[in-house]
From Swiss-Prot:
Family listed: Belongs to the eIF-2-beta/eIF-5 family.
Compositionally biased tracts (Acidic residues): 106-118
PTM sites of type N6-acetyllysine: K263, K291
MF terms in GO: translation initiation factor activity; zinc ion binding
Name this polypeptide is given: Eukaryotic translation initiation factor 2 subunit 2
Ranges annotated as biased composition (Basic and acidic residues): 40-51
SUPFAM superfamilies listed in its UniProt record: Translation initiation factor 2 beta, aIF2beta, N-terminal domain (SSF100966), Zinc-binding domain of translation initiation factor 2 beta (SSF75689)
GO CC, alphabetical: cytosol; eukaryotic translation initiation factor 2 complex; synapse
One of the protein's GO biological processes: in utero embryonic development
Composition-biased stretches (Basic residues): 13-22
């Protein structure tokens, strides 16, 4: 830089900073900027009223711009939801309306409400009918009439002792023979007609332990007499069912090898009575056991039925030794 330019000139006046004025409009509507305004070197003090008017105009313009922006946004969005006005419920008005309704209903009621109520209730609830039971005389009369009708019908079936085909040459039917059989059974067994069945009563077996490995059946002979069976037959059945061996001693007591309780011997005796004592037809204990050509037959003394009975089979016996096996095969 040259020396002339660097010299300080005291006569030069200092430049004053210009105040920034806001955007203003003229009366004609033309925008007035800083360039249009005359540049003044001197400070001009604006009046306070003019500044206030300018500030108010600025605020109004800002509010308008904000409202325009909000309108644009609302155009894209849905319309603003209107708040629903809440209706206030008035208790006094409701009570008056209820009173009016009651007065109208009372005025509409008929003069005779009881008859209508009876009609309505009669449809819904059915009255119970009084059931009258017939008297004994009427029942007896009906029974007699039915008996007369049955007697008129000639079925050829009679429950008397005389046979229906006695005075005629016709053949008897199956039903007539069946009725005759039942009549004979009723005559010979009056207990069965009354509905009472004879119970077979037997003494319980008396079992005593003999030593450590034997059992004694004390009243064995007494039970054989009650059952009307031979001791040999009952002994063979007991030994076969228990799977052991035994014999009768001098006191007529059965001595069995092994330990047995009273319940076990009772179960064996029940099976023997069911198979070899009671009749398979009428369940009567009055029977006789007969042997005919290696078969046993059970004959009943009440119904005179006769049926075969299974023979007593011993249990499985293991054969030991080679010679015993050869003998068993040879036999």
């Amino acid at each position: 830089m040259s020396g002339d330019e660097m010299i300080f000139d005291p006569t030069m006046s200092k430049k004053k900073k210009k105040k920034k004025k806001p955007f203003m409009l003229d009366e004609e509507g033309d925008a007035q900027t800083e360039e249009t305004q005359p540049s003044e070197t001197k400070e001009v003090e604006p009046e306070p009223t003019e500044e206030k008017d300018v500030d108010a105009d600025e605020e109004d313009s800002r509010k308008k711009d904000a409202s325009d922006d909000l309108d644009d946004l609302n155009f894209f969005n849905q319309k603003k939801k209107k708040k629903k006005t809440k209706k206030i419920f008035d208790i006094d008005e409701a009570e008056e309306a209820i009173k009016d309704v009651k007065i109208e209903s009372d005025a509409q009621e008929p003069a005779e409400p009881e008859d209508d109520l009876d009609i309505m209730l009669g449809n819904k609830k059915k009255k119970k009918k009084n059931v009258k039971f017939p008297e004994e005389d009427e029942i007896l009369e009906k029974d007699e009439a039915l008996e007369d009708e049955d007697s008129k019908k000639d079925d050829g079936i009679s429950f008397s002792s005389q046979t229906a085909w006695a005075g005629s040459e016709r053949d008897y039917t199956y039903e007539e023979l069946l009725n005759r059989v039942f009549n004979i059974m009723r005559e010979k067994n009056p207990d069965m007609v009354a509905g009472e069945k004879r119970k077979f009563v037997m003494k319980p077996p008396q079992v005593v332990r003999v030593g450590t490995k034997k059992t004694s059946f004390v009243n064995f002979t007494d039970i054989c007499k009650l059952l009307h069976r031979q001791p040999k037959h009952l002994l063979a059945f007991l030994l076969a069912e228990l799977g052991t061996s035994g014999s009768i001693d001098g006191n007529n007591q059965l001595v069995i090898k092994g330990r047995f309780q009273q319940k076990q011997i009772e179960n064996v005796l029940r099976r023997y009575i069911k198979e070899y004592v009671t009749c398979h037809t009428c369940r009567s204990p009055d029977t006789i056991l007969q042997k005919d050509t290696r078969l046993y037959f059970l004959q009943c003394e009440t119904c005179h039925s006769r049926c075969s009975v299974a023979s007593i089979k011993t249990g499985f016996q293991a054969v030991t030794g080679k010679r015993a096996q050869l003998r068993a095969k040879a036999n």
